[in-house]
Swiss-Prot record:
Binds 2 nickel ions per subunit. SUPFAM superfamilies: Composite domain of metallo-dependent hydrolases (SSF51338), Metallo-dependent hydrolases (SSF51556). CDD domains: Urease_alpha. The active site is at H323 (proton donor). Pathway: Nitrogen metabolism; urea degradation; CO(2) and NH(3) from urea (urease route): step 1/1. Belongs to the metallo-dependent hydrolases superfamily. Urease alpha subunit family. Carboxylation allows a single lysine to coordinate two nickel ions. Its EC number is 3.5.1.5. It comes from the Bacteria. Heterotrimer of UreA (gamma), UreB (beta) and UreC (alpha) subunits. Three heterotrimers associate to form the active enzyme. One of its GO terms (biological process) is urea catabolic process. This is Urease subunit alpha.
Amino acid sequence: MSFEMSREQYASLYGPTTGDAIRLADTELFARIEKDLTAPGEEAVFGGGKVVRDGMGQNGRLGRDEDVPDLVITNVVVIDWTGICKADVAVRDGHIMRIGKAGNPHVMDGVDIVIGVATDVIAGEGKILTAGGIDSHIHFISPDQIETALVSGITTMIGGGTGPSESTKATTITPGAWNIHNMLRSFEQFPMNFGLLGKGHGSSVPAMAEQITAGAIGLKIHEDWGATPSSINTSLQVADEYDVQVAIHTDTLNEAGFVEDTRAAIAGRVIHTFHTEGAGGGHAPDIIELAQDPNILPASTNPTLPYTRNTLEEHLDMLMVCHHLNPGIPEDVAFADSRIRKETIAAEDVLQDMGIFSMTSSDSQAMGRVGEVVLRTWQVADSMKRQRGPLPEDEGTGGDNHRIRRYIAKYTINPATAHGISHAVGSVEEGKFADLVLWEPRFFGVKPDLILKGGQMVHGVMGDPNASIPTPQPRWYRRAFGAYGTAVAASSITFLSRAAIRAGVPETLGLRKVVRECRDIRTLTKADMKLNGETPPLRVDPQTYEVRVDGTPVTCEPQHVLPMAQRYFLF
């Protein structure tokens, strides 16, 4: 016997379905559901008088060893670079077990996820599920960054540093085995995945390679240590030998060479360019031109994203502090001024929107905000839709799915791919580590509802602990059980090089966290940057700083009002 109800009534009970669209926060972005893997009339819903009860939606005969998940997130909308769908998402042993239809196959049709005695349930009706974000430009200055990043939806942090030293405030580098080992020990306490970058400065391959054997998953080249052709070449020699990544902040002052000299030193080898627009550092004024090369994996950092009326004004003081410059020295002020170019900053949002820039990241506490990678990525997407209209791929579809998939890839799968960890994290796909973020649509990209690490709940919005129910005010972010005790070791990954794992670093340091290797990096090209692999000719005019893409000028207007801003925050 069939039963009909309106789409509105169905969505209020079970969440939206195929053809429905969800507005993301207060933006002009609409996610249209492409397919629904659940079955109408057979939805698995938990609660009093609902479906997931023994002998109904739950199979009470099957034990955990009989292909039963540990957790099911029911009827949730999955937004991922792979697509936008509605499904039940099953987690087992800390990994995504299956994306499909949950329930009891004895009484329900189409079930490929069997809810059993061992299964917990999170209600995903009316909510959005994404992969945990990956911030690949972290200055490890303060450990307080970690929780700030986590509650913004970031579950993996890659970068370098040792604390509030002057070099860490300026450069994302953890130099040498002793510092690397101490940072790896410290990371054991936090429900976050980590990867470290060693110092990419030296003329000796063995001296730099020992950092990889010690546990770094790559090397970082930074102009404050000297971004010379020699350092670039030596770092890439190490990277090619050990299958790790090199990240680079190029030479703003053009002291050791111009952008053409850096390109020659790179010599076609894959490299991850940080803040490729240049305000965060890099050859002035034309570092952008590297983004046309097929071996360059270009990223932006978030202080210039999106372009607003305040962007230029805040950058000078920010830059002086971060790079240990003296405002009383004219040469230091000139150095800072050379980075801050309205024309290239105005082009940056457009290059992101066109898929020419592939990633976003923070540059945490060093000209970037660690808790705003997700937020600012979506603000750029909204700004570009308002100024440039729908992407050609979205014309006539009733949604913005291609643009949404492009932008979510910028802080999930693409940084994971660039650093050789996409086999473990970076997307909502079966077999991957269950780093998942649950959002209410009205708070999407701004304030997550619940953060899962390795399938464990580690943080989320919770009400007064003394209340009789979980929801009374004040509601704020509180740690969950997965963030305490030895559960942290099972909920999070420490990424190491293959050489470090073979050298026994986890055993030597007594690491308890899950250890995974970085791999398959040196064969990457920009074509591997999902939905963000465009390589058109780029040119920056050396006099006017105008940016041209395939001969056409690109720019945008500074925004005066943004979504996902004062409507959601007091400060």
